[in-house]
Amino acid sequence: MSRPKIFLGISLITLSVLMLELSLTRLFSATMYYHFAFMAISLALFGSGASGVFIYIVQRGLKPEHTGQWLSLAAMSFALSNVFSLYVILSNPLTFETGPENYYRLAKIYGAAALPFFFAGCAVTLAITRLASEISKLYLFDLAGAALGCLLLIPVLNLIGAINIVLLVSSLAALAGVLFGSSTAGSRAATICSLLLALGSAVLVAYNSSTHRIDIRKSKGFEETSVLFSKWNSFSRITVEGDFDSGVEIKIDADAATGISKDASNSAIHQDARDSLSGLLRIT
């Protein structure tokens, strides 16, 4: 078993986990509400903790000579479940209602979004179990990958947005699977599958960056039907919605709207603002 490849693979896994966790804080704030951003932290803790218990239970059935294959399988599962969780998040928008349907959607989001962290945790836990004699080196690569993921997030988020970061994470996780698979003899199938998955995810990132086919269509219970401009930054998603004849609005995370109009004197948007201000002054 090639230990350097295992170490590099773990670095890619932890890099991917931190990028995913932090990008989910932005995605949850845009698709749901800002206080749900902190749910990403609990998801990471829940998934990682569950993976530790799982590996502890099944580790005796995992033959040491097949460690590379199991690590590669965990990395591929991380990549695939990540795409699945993104689909669930985007197709189950929360609303202002408090009925059972809304709670069911939230449960689906929580369960699906925890899966990538579970499989990533399985890879890290299994590597620590099998390479306990070199835990200092493994932990070094673990922390280095996590730190690099945090540093890369802001420039990459500004460049391609939170949704494409989630897709990019799948490519990086699958690339870790390539390293894991090639670290052990007899893991050619796992290596090839991981490589194909990494390339496919990379192509999907490039395609979606130019077409925006995978994007937020409904947020906070409202359809986004007239988006003129959309851009992610390190702390929010900015959209411009409406039409230039009646006026447009700039929104932060599908909320906090600010109206813009060509004709400020006759704008219905500004009239609403003046009416609201007049009502406020009468109350006070």
Each predicted region: which residue ranges?
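Alpha-helical transmembrane segments of multi-pass membrane proteins
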Residues: M1-T284
